[in-house]
From Swiss-Prot:
SUPFAM superfamilies documented for this protein: Phosphoglucomutase, C-terminal domain, Phosphoglucomutase, first 3 domains
Pfam family name, one: PGM_PMM_I
Gene of this entry: glmM
EC number assigned by the record: 5.4.2.10
Classification of source organism: Bacteria, Pseudomonadati, Pseudomonadota, Gammaproteobacteria, Vibrionales
Family in the record: Belongs to the phosphohexose mutase family.
Keyword terms, alphabetized: Isomerase, Magnesium, Metal-binding, Phosphoprotein
Protein name per its UniProtKB record: Phosphoglucosamine mutase
Residues with the Phosphoserine modification: S103
PTM summary: Activated by phosphorylation.
Amino acid sequence: MSDKRRYFGTDGVRGKVGQYPITPDFVLKLGWAAGRVLAKQGTKKVIIGKDTRISGYMLESALEAGLAAAGLKATFTGPMPTPAVAYLTQTFRAEAGIVISASHNPYYDNGIKFFSSEGTKLPDDIELAIEAELDKEIECVESAELGKATRLNDAAGRYIEFCKSTFPSELSLAKLKIVVDCANGATYHIAPNVFTELGADVIAMGVTPNGTNINHEVGATDVRALQQRVVEEQADLGLAFDGDGDRIIMVDHLGNKVDGDQIAYIIARDALRRGELKGGVVGTLMTNLGMENGLKQLGIPFVRAAVGDRYVMEKLLEKGWKIGAENSGHVILLDKVTTGDAIVAALQVLASVVGSELSLNELSKGMTLYPQVLENVRFAGQGNPLEAEAVKKTVEDVEADLGSKGRVLLRKSGTEPLIRVMVEGEDGELVQNSALKIAQAVKDNC
């Protein structure tokens, strides 16, 4: 079996709807191939959730047909956050969980990602085995062995109760006014209820999905509307989720953005204070130097993984640690969940706010973020602009200018046709100009 991936990226199979591989015929075959690999003795049951994209209806039907042809039973949850599907996969003792989502991407993209029976992302060897099955012709099981579909009507209620169980029972959110932005995505009918039931005064936004407005000027990838609303409502803080509920960005009462690095720092520091920190914190190559330095001052170990929550997870398991995060808002808390869970992560920060009687603004001041600029350069051509001599020379010049007080990172996105340029350092103006200079060099060589 080849170890070269053709379809699976860092977060499953993803692309533009109607363009290969996100087409009904390919997704049907993907369902069949996955069913062939995942089928074992036992229930042969798969949980299928989706976000609020209009294409989700088409793709879940195609998936179910493929799974049924392989003899697996599909249980639909309807719109459901990615971590909820991971949780339900475990509690239902299903063979696997499948999420139809493109996370933070625009509505016209979609994707398919899988969870194992333990609620974790599939190992590489299983994904490669599924790709190998895709080369074969579809063969249906015998008619009597065909799978059938059912619907789980109380999926949202089950997950709401789970989320609430991760919040300390002796605490309440009764004194907090919170603006909750659900990105018109999968948390729209869940997150507001979680925080309301724990006592908060909740102002909900981004809770009217229409199939095409997911992540559009709302949610974790664009917090401007949330920042404005928090200030207007004189709220204590704001929470922004992405389209599938695995990313969380927060906003303090002054309208300042609090990103995944700061969220992980607050959670780790609170765990240290309680004597419950198990090991250190895993970040990524994109993690701000300010977080690394802040943790170091507390005596908390820190290591970097490759960019992508699956690599953060791998490093956590390797080290035996419990807290990992990306600055984009993926926060993994392995003492509570099996994957990145935005609602659960938010609840841990809120527990720190309530327990310490400090504001989110005060808690986030424990670390100082370095100015960091990220430029995305669209890249759909052949070759690798990162290997171009002109690009290498520009990077060398910038690194010389930054010296030991900054760093540069160039990488290809694992989910979109983009080259990501990140520059970080103490001098904000130098960082901005350096990022633009490198981005232009990349554009010139695409």
